[in-house]
């Protein structure tokens, strides 16, 4: 039967490939172009930048005897991928007997230059590009200094230039002393997360650049926290071309969405630096140092900061505080590092990298209540936790790249290394009840864990607590590589890329675990003195060969083959130290001095070693059709982009699981086909941008979940393996819309998205809850019926002619349909339950700016409704509302006052104390001295003392309402000093 299915599958695959091949052939035969298309870009030999338009740049195509074949005046255009300005001329040359020609380039103030060029022709399509560098004939020519367009006539906030969204930084009024994060938080359509992630128009920014180049590539927070906002000229958002696309001269992939921070001219060369120091009440402190040196071909930056004010959680100038950070707590951070970049003006080579070090202390306390939904009746938990952690992190990343401008070949090598060490100790308490306690969680736990606690607590299911201390170490070392070779006299090429990685980690934890439950009308006690040791090392080797076939002018075929090998070796040893008589009365962290004694305490049922060898073969057929309509200046007027990419993946595993009781050997293999389709449309005059995406992705279950074993290492949460797990299939459909030129001149912004995701054979946890003991037994199973849908719409527009009053609305609706299995002990099999959840949110902003006054109103509301097929399910409805106002006002004598007042409202929660209103007020007064080189500030944080971190939410299985500790209100005096030193003009 399996053989028949395999043959049937192969026949269907062959038919599909045959149809695709015929389709390509038909398209190819219909679009033959025998002319050679030559693109010429004229640049300055010294700066490496395109010449200015007023230079009257001209290029002649000559035969070897100097006979003029064609002549043209260069036109200015912006590269759609990198945003770079170019002076371009194009020639369409029919087939010639002699393929050798001369290019003659001339421009006012520059020496004429002759460059030989050899053209080629083929049956499908021939195209090539050439850069010509001209040298100036005068030593100085200030009249022709290159410059960039400035938005000075009006303080327009944003506009589109081709495929680039440009924000004018000077149009935003910020608090004195604001860093880059304060600016980005105010950009229309941009969203800044607490961890430094940036989203623009709903899409994640993959890289944050400084003047077009990487800056601490793996950590956005360095630039966000240390670059002063006053240095920024523009913020540009665009899809950056990949290195392969640049070398081929045409788009072969989507590249990556980047946010490029363009500095003002006076800060783009020389030394700049700033330092800030502050001290306040409640022993709050802050210190920061940042220095940056620019030259035309290099950059060096150094930073360092220390603080205990949780500076990732702060007002954003729009009445908001960013998203809730579940790590929370009180954090003291010390971090520093440096970044370097060296490159030549012709982009032949680039050396860049960074080194980072950080040391963090965190005190995280949280507590509250939660409700677990069960078919036989809900259970209620009162819980509290405190964990103190210290972490040391070191990392370094480097990139070395070389490009041959003559052959358009390139290569890069990127090594990395990171090290981390963590120490922690924690205390956890929990009480589980069959009926919701009347007292608040703190009173319940204090009574439950007091020395005089009584075993006759009403409705108690279990009492459990744990004290723990431990540490962990981790190292990650590896390197990625990339090589591209362009086929001579063609638009084709191939690349070889991949990476090698080794990850090593180990950890050890001591914990004292106490568990009490009622059984046969007697309170049972389970005490465990445990030592957990983990050791893991992973090795990955990956290589890919990809060919880029320029089929016709508009059609590309990019097949690739990827081979990947992963080896994982692990060791988990659990020691039950309470089995040793000498452990009685010992403090947490005790180990016997002899290894023989330690081995006697080994829990053989929950200790194991394992080795996994995984091989993955992937064949990808990437077909693209791109159609652009351009004007005489090479600006895109409309576009079509279609991508069809089927992937054929075969994965094999060899898993050796070694334990004292049940060693196992597994060799699962999977076919994991994938399919991706994308359609992108730029309507005429680029008035609208439309994107449609469809994907089907098959994935295999984790090999460890296929083991036939029962893990009882945690006596309250038992897990059971499932050898019968199947592959899952994820289907995604999404549509994105963005208004482009349609609303650009009116300074309006409109974008939206809608999508649907469904999973076949989704992996879900089927669990059984024992109401007598409070023990949960979980097994991973396949389920059908999981899907979710969403829709988002965002709109920004001015409400007056002079664009002083701006209005922004952001709406979203998310619907979740979730299926899983749950039961209590009274039922034989877990019951299939279906949960439907609707999450709706709306944010409104109104901002007024006139001269030195910036006022704003903000309102946001989130509504969450949930229903379930569980018997007796309460169908909760919760509201989270935020509204307030903020202001930034410039006063006489170089003073500035900024303040925000926000009301946080919560409704619909089970705990009465959660349904509350918190009014939060912050203010800052600053004064600038010495021509703005020195700034004095006084901050007042949470003046009314109402700020609270509340983590409240729900899913298909539970609802929770937790409080975390927050920074107490404080006042701080801060001093900021700025330094800008430019090289002397010769």
Where are these regions (language model features)?
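A short, amphipathic beta-strand motif
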Residues: 36-48, 132
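Primarily recognizes Gram-negative and organellar outer-membrane beta-barrels
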Residues: 37, 218-221, 241-283, 298-986
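Short, ordered, surface-exposed loop/turn motifs in non-cytosolic proteins
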Residues: 47-72, 160
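Short, acidic, small-residue-rich periplasmic hinge/interaction motif at the N-terminus
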Residues: 62, 106-108, 128-170, 193-195, ...
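A short, solvent-exposed loop/turn motif at the edges and junctions
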Residues: 66-68, 87-90, 94-119
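Extracytoplasmic beta-strand/coil segments of soluble accessory domains associated
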Residues: 181-216, 244-253
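Short acidic/polar hinge/loop motifs at secondary-structure boundaries
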Residues: 213-241, 296
């Amino acid at each position: 039967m399996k053989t028949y299915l395999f043959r049937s599958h192969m026949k269907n695959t062959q038919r599909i490939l045959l149809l695709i091949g015929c389709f390509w052939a038909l398209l190819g035969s219909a679009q033959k172009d025998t002319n050679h298309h030559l693109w010429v870009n004229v640049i300055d030999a010294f700066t490496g930048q395109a010449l200015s338009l007023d230079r009257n740049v001209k290029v002649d195509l000559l035969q070897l005897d100097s006979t003029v074949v064609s002549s043209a005046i260069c036109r200015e255009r912006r590269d759609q991928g990198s945003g770079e300005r170019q002076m371009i001329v194009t020639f369409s040359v029919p087939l010639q007997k002699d393929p050798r020609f001369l290019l003659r380039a001339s421009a006012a103030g520059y020496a004429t230059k002759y460059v030989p060029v050899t053209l080629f022709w083929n049956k499908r399509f021939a195209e090539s590009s050439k850069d010509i560098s001209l040298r100036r004939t005068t030593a100085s020519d200030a009249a022709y200094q290159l410059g960039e367009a400035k938005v000075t006539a009006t303080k327009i906030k944003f506009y589109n230039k081709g495929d680039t969204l440009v924000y004018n930084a000077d149009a935003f009024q910020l608090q004195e002393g604001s860093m880059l994060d304060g600016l980005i938080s105010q950009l229309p359509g941009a969203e800044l997360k607490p961890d430094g992630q940036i989203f623009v128009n709903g899409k994640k920014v993959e890289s944050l650049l400084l003047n077009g180049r990487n800056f601490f590539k793996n950590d956005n927070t360095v630039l966000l926290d240390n670059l002063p906002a006053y240095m920024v000229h523009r913020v540009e958002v665009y899809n950056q071309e990949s290195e392969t696309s640049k070398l081929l001269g045409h788009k072969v992939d989507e590249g990556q969405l980047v946010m490029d921070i363009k500095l003002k001219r006076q800060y783009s060369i020389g030394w700049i630096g700033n330092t800030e120091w502050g001290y306040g009440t409640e022993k709050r402190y802050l210190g920061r140092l940042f220095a940056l040196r620019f030259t035309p071909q290099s950059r060096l930056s150094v930073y360092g900061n220390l603080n205990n004010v949780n500076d990732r959680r702060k007002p954003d100038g729009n009445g908001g505080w960013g998203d809730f950070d579940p790590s929370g707590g009180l954090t003291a951070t010390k971090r520093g590092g440096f970044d370097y970049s060296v490159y030549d003006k012709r982009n032949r080579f680039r050396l860049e990298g960074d080194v980072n070090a950080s040391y963090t202390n965190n005190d995280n306390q949280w507590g509250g209540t939660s409700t677990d939904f069960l078919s036989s009746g809900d259970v209620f938990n009162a819980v509290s936790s405190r964990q103190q952690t210290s972490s040391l992190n070191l990392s370094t990343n480097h990139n070395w790249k070389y490009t041959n401008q003559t052959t358009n070949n390139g290569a890069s090598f990127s090594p990395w290394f990171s090290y981390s060490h963590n120490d922690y100790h924690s205390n956890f308490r929990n009480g589980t009840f069959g009926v919701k306690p009347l007292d608040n969680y703190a009173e319940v736990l204090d009574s439950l864990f007091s020395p005089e606690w009584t075993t006759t607590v009403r409705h108690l299911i279990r009492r459990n607590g744990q004290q723990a201390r431990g540490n962990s170490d981790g190292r990650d070392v590896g390197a990625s590589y990339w090589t591209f070779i362009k086929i001579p006299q063609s638009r084709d090429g191939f690349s070889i890329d991949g990476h090698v990685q080794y990850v090593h980690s180990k950890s050890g934890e001591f914990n004292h675990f106490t568990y009490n439950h009622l059984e046969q009308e007697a309170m049972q006690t389970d005490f465990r003195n445990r030592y957990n040791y983990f050791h893991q090392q992973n090795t990955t080797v990956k290589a890919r060969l990809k060919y880029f076939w320029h089929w016709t002018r508009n059609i590309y075929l990019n097949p690739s083959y990827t081979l990947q090998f992963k080896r994982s070796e692990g060791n988990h040893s659990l020691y039950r130290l309470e089995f040793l008589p000498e452990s009685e009365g010992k403090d947490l962290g005790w180990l016997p001095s002899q290894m023989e004694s330690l081995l006697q305490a080994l829990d053989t049922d929950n200790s194991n070693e394992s080795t996994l060898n995984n091989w993955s073969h992937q064949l990808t057929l990437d077909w693209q059709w791109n159609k652009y309509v351009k004007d005489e200046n090479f600006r895109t007027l409309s576009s079509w982009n279609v991508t069809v990419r089927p992937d054929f993946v075969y994965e094999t595993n060899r898993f050796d699981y070694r334990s004292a009781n049940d060693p196992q050997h597994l060799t699962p293999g999977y076919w994991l086909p994938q399919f991706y389709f994308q359609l992108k449309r730029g309507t005429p005059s680029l008035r609208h941008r439309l994107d449609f995406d469809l994907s089907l992705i098959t994935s295999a279950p984790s090999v460890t979940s296929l083991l036939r074993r029962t893990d009882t290492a945690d006596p309250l949460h038992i897990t059971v393996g499932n050898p019968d797990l199947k592959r899952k299939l994820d289907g995604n459909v999404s549509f994105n819309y963005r208004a482009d030129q349609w609303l650009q001149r009116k300074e309006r912004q409109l974008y939206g998205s809608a999508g649907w995701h469904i999973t076949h054979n989704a992996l879900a946890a089927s669990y059984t809850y024992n109401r007598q003991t409070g023990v949960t037994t979980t097994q991973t199973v396949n389920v059908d019926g999981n899907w979710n849908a969403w829709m988002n719409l965002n709109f920004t527009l001015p409400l007056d002619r002079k664009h002083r009053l701006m209005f922004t609305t952001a709406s979203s609706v998310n619907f979740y349909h979730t299926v899983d299995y749950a039961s209590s002990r009274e039922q034989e099999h877990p019951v299939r339950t279906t949960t439907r959840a609707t999450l709706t949110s709306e944010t409104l902003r109104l901002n007024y700016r006139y001269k030195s006054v910036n006022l704003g109103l903000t309102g946001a509301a989130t509504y969450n409704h949930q229903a379930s097929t569980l018997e007796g399910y309460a169908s909760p409805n919760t509201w989270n509302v935020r509204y307030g106002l903020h202001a930034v006002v410039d006063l006489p004598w170089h003073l500035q006052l900024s303040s925000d007042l926000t009301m946080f409202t919560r409704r619909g929660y089970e705990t009465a104390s959660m349904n509350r209103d918190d009014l939060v007020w912050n203010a800052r007064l600053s004064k600038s001295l010495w021509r703005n080189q020195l700034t004095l500030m006084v901050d007042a944080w949470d003046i009314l003392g109402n700020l609270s971190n509340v983590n409240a939410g729900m899913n298909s299985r539970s609802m929770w309402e937790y409080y975390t500790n927050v920074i107490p209100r404080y006042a701080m005096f801060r001093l900021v000093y700025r330094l800008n030193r430019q090289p002397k003009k010769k």
